[in-house]
């Protein structure tokens, strides 16, 4: 994670919106989505970056199943800090150029406007759009408070309460 200090204020628009950071005790519930500007050409061939921001709704895969799938390809176990997902649409996934991009979760299904950052793109297959292996993301919920308090500073307010 990084904090970027901007020279001027950002004007929020339909295309520029903040994302909420999760609580450390976030429950894994609510729809997930990924966005990115990465390669839109599935399979091989010359990469073609997106002309417009791409959106894909995804489903979470339980970590033990994801670990079993990836264990056949790599000789490392996934960590509890990983989240695995599969695309809802066959042949669609994150791809080269999407690394570090957001995985967001909608915690308020009554509103399409309350999204929290759940993770960042970490790994996938070389064959974009491959549905045989889940996509891998790094969770951020366990790191957010530590990072905010120890890297940014100790004078941040606590999360607002629900009351």
Map each language-model feature to its residues.
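Internal amphipathic alpha-helical segments of the cytochrome P450 catalytic fold
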Residues: 12-13, 92, 117, 145
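Eukaryotic short linear interaction motifs
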Residues: 11, 41-43, 67, 92-93, ...
């Amino acid at each position: 994670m990084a904090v970027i200090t901007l020279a001027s204020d950002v004007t929020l628009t339909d295309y520029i919106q903040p994302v909420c950071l999760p609580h450390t005790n976030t429950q894994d519930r609510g729809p997930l989505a990924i966005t990115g500007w990465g390669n839109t050409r599935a399979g091989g061939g010359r990469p073609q970056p997106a002309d417009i921001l791409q959106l894909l709704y995804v489903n979470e895969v339980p970590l033990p199943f994801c670990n079993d799938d990836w264990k056949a390809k790599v000789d490392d176990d996934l960590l509890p800090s990983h989240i695995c997902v599969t695309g809802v649409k066959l042949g669609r996934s994150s791809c080269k150029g999407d690394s570090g991009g957001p995985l967001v979760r909608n915690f308020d299904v009554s509103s399409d406007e309350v999204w929290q950052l759940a993770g960042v793109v970490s790994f996938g297959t070389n064959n974009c759009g491959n549905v045989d292996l889940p996509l891998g993301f790094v969770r951020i919920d366990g790191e957010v408070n530590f990072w905010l308090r120890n890297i940014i500073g100790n004078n941040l307010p606590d999360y607002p309460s629900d009351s």
